[in-house]
């Protein structure tokens, strides 16, 4: 049987995650932002490509054939027909491909240091007692990360399709090797990649959801769960919940694209949050690493931190000012289309100011959690994330940055880890890694997992 086919038991109570409100079927028309449908459906064999991958770089952005934003609704059928009430076994997996992982982990094999490193390296471990904050005295708990360790690693190259990437499978193999040297056991690591020969180990939408069920099953305080996704990401228009409220300050939900997204749809951030965060008990750690476009808030964690270690808030005036600057530059160069676009962007920012503030507060009210969830993502919600080649190996820029920092000096704080990853990427890429959390955190505490 495949991961996730079982009920969760926390404190003697059984919980069965309901997925009915998330129905993202195939699109009925062309997707937003000019992405047309691909020339054909994904191949059925999911075998290796007939030749070496091309040498140019792509971003981990919306694949062609993505779904129309105004056609997604939080309603409808259950996601999958299986009953989650049986046992659970991790899928059998073939031996690793020798051709894809010969260089080893980034940051090892004598690679040079990446330059200036932030932080003194003297960091306190997170407190083990219950924490509280806010006027309602909301409680949460850091994880000691000394319980069971489990990991789910998802890498999708979209082999043989128009959306093909080169780095995700390598990223998964590299992260797996990293985790094996940090207390994780191979029997507690599940990999889903599209070069697998085992059907249940292929990263389809249902397999990913089932594997997430396995990851969170029987989670307990001080367990350490690790989720890594490398592949395409995108956005879709935020839809109101049953009370008519929105939780995205920019008006868009973030999504990830399974291998079969064209037929079975994407996976939206609300669903990821409900499965990976809401189900966890206080003191259980979920460390999520997203190497995909538009991934800044893809786990819907309401507390986002800057490289100064302070909470970020929506900056509508800054966005409006950027639109006015674009309009002025377009006027100077005689670009009438650019003038209109810049002014429209500025007006839209002002109009969205009220909704943005309300959505941000509503997100904190509904998405704050007592567990210890942390998300490290490759870029802001409005940015793309690079699929690149570093040291002769195809890799995602974010996966590379995380592994390089942690391999060269695993004694990091939340803040120094974020700063050092940005340092690695800023010389070649415009993307800015993001740090979000399920509760307020002290960014100067030691990053453990």
Curated annotation (Swiss-Prot):
Q: Biased composition, Pro residues: where in the chain?
A: 27-55
Q: Where is the active site?
A: 232, 293
**GO molecular function (one):** cysteine-type endopeptidase activity
Q: What class of enzyme is it?
A: hydrolase
Which lineage ranks, top first, belong to the organism behind this chain? Eukaryota, Fungi, Dikarya, Ascomycota, Saccharomycotina
Q: GO biological process: any one?
A: apoptotic process
- Annotated family: Belongs to the peptidase C14B family.
**Which spans does this entry mark as compositional bias, Low complexity?**
10-26, 67-91, 98-112
Presence of the UniProt keyword Protease in the record: yes
Keyword Cell inner membrane (UniProt): no
Its function, per the record, reads:
Involved in cell death (apoptosis).
Protein name as it appears in the record: Metacaspase-1
| SUPFAM superfamilies listed in its UniProt record | Caspase-like
Composition skew (Polar residues), residue ranges: 56-66, 119-132
Instruction: Tell me which GO cellular component terms the UniProt record holds.
Output: cytoplasm
């Amino acid at each position: 049987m495949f991961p996730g086919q079982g009920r969760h038991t926390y404190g003697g109570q059984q919980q069965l995650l309901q997925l009915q409100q998330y129905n993202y079927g195939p699109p009925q028309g062309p997707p937003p932002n000019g992405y047309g449908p691909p020339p054909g459906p994904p191949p059925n064999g999911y075998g290796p490509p007939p030749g070496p991958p091309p040498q140019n770089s792509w971003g981990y952005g919306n694949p062609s054939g993505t779904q129309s934003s105004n056609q997604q609704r939080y309603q409808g059928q259950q996601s999958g027909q299986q009953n989650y009430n049986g046992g659970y076994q991790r899928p059998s997996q073939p031996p690793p491909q020798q051709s894809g992982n010969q260089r080893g982990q980034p940051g090892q094999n004598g690679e040079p240091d990446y330059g200036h490193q932030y932080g003194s390296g003297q960091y306190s471990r997170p407190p083990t007692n219950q924490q509280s904050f806010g006027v309602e005295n909301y409680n949460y708990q850091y994880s000691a990360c000394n319980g069971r360790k489990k990991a789910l690693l998802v890498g999708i190259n979209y082999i043989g399709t128009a959306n093909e990437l080169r780095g995700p499978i390598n990223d998964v193999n590299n992260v797996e090797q990293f985790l094996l040297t940090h207390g994780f056991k191979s029997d507690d690591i599940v990999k889903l990649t599209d070069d697998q020969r085992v059907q249940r180990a292929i990263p389809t939408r249902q397999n990913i959801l089932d594997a997430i069920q396995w990851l969170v099953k029987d989670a307990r305080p001080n367990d350490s769960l690790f989720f890594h996704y490398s592949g395409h990401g995108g956005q879709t228009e935020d839809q109101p919940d049953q009370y008519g409220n929105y939780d995205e300050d920019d008006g868009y939900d973030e999504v990830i694209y399974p291998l079969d997204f064209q037929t079975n749809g994407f996976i939206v951030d609300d669903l990821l949050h409900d499965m990976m965060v809401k189900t966890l008990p206080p003191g259980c750690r979920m460390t999520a690493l997203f190497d995909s476009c538009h991934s800044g808030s893809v786990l819907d964690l309401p507390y986002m931190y800057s490289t100064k270690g302070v909470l970020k808030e929506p900056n509508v005036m800054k966005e409006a000012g950027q639109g006015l600057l674009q309009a002025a530059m377009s006027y100077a160069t005689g670009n009438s289309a650019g003038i209109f676009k810049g002014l429209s962007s500025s007006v839209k920012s002002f109009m969205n100011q009220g909704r943005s503030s309300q959505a941000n507060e509503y997100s904190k009210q509904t998405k704050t959690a007592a567990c210890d969830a942390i998300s490290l993502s490759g870029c802001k919600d409005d940015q793309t994330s690079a699929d690149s080649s570093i040291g002769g190996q195809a890799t995602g820029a974010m996966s590379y940055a995380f592994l390089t920092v942690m391999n060269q000096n695993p004694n990091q704080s939340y803040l120094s880890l974020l700063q050092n990853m940005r340092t690695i990427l800023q010389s070649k890429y415009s993307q800015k890694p993001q740090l979000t959390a399920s509760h307020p955190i002290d960014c100067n505490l030691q990053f453990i997992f």
